[in-house]
Amino acid sequence: MKRTISIGFCLLLSASLMTTPSLHAKVMKMKLATVVVPHHAYNEGAREFARRIKEATGGAIDIRVFPGGQLGKGERELLEGMQMGAIDLAVTATGPVSGFSQSMMVLDLPFLFRDYPHVDAVLDGPVGRKLLDDLEKAKLKGLSFFENGFRNFTNSVRPLLKPEDFKGLKFRTMENPVHLASVRELGAQAVPMSWGEVYTSLQTKVIDGQENPVAIIHSYKLNEVQKYLSLTGHFYSPAPLTMGLRQFTSLKPEWQRLFITTAVEVTAYERKIIRDNEQKQVLDLKAWGMDVTNVDKAIFLKAMEPVYAKFIKQYPDWEPIVHRIRDTK
């Protein structure tokens, strides 16, 4: 009887050791950073990613999420931090990423994506994976594409219903050549600026406006410093979940696969949060006093069309990518 109990106990102990790290095993601690406020969808997705990784590894990997620019006020700092090994993972906009991988910048072309189903078909397919893989040249590992949504203009001067309304206004953009060129095509002055400076610059009238997805406009209560919101949807804003390449390759192969598959699964979770909240957030902004207008996107596309010719001339390898994206159903 004692022998039976002993064998049973040993089997139970062995099973528990397979799913729970040893008391003496070293837990691998990682940092995942963003620059956005804690309740933004980036961070909800990041926390879910961390939770699933911890659960799947039996607690052997513990990822802590640092929101709100705690590890770097600008997204470029986060990307550089991953290259240096000071930060393990980050969720950022593609704007700063384009400074590390020019192929990623193709996603920032104006009116490239028709709608959210088109986005999913492109970014979750071969085109998206190739763009993520290109980041390895910059010592970064692209895991998947979170999102921030389609970007829209806000300003404190007047409603923006047509391109001519932009003339003479100063707009903050990300440090991204495509964004800068696109805003200039509308006749506005484009001012590249890190996100941490934007609210104060709007408040003090250093700039007249900015452009961002509804989620950011809502999360940061830009209605307090901006009167007008034009739902232009001129750029789609993907947000790569990225890891330092050195940190990624230091993982054993099964954990590398786990990080990629978990990132892809959590991406659907994060995008759903953005999309489900968007309509309610627009209604909130109206209730908070913003003048919200829809626009004829076709006239904005026509005004920004020269941007395509300019950048395809500069980067000829973009042309087949643009065609593949536009042909994706």
PLM regions and their residue ranges:
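Bacterial N-terminal signal peptides
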Residues: G8-T19
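Short linear, low-complexity motifs centered on an aromatic residue
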Residues: K2, P21-H24
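N-terminal secretory/targeting leader peptides
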Residues: H24-H118, V127-R129, L135-K329
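Bacterial N-terminal signal peptides that target proteins for export
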Residues: M1-F9
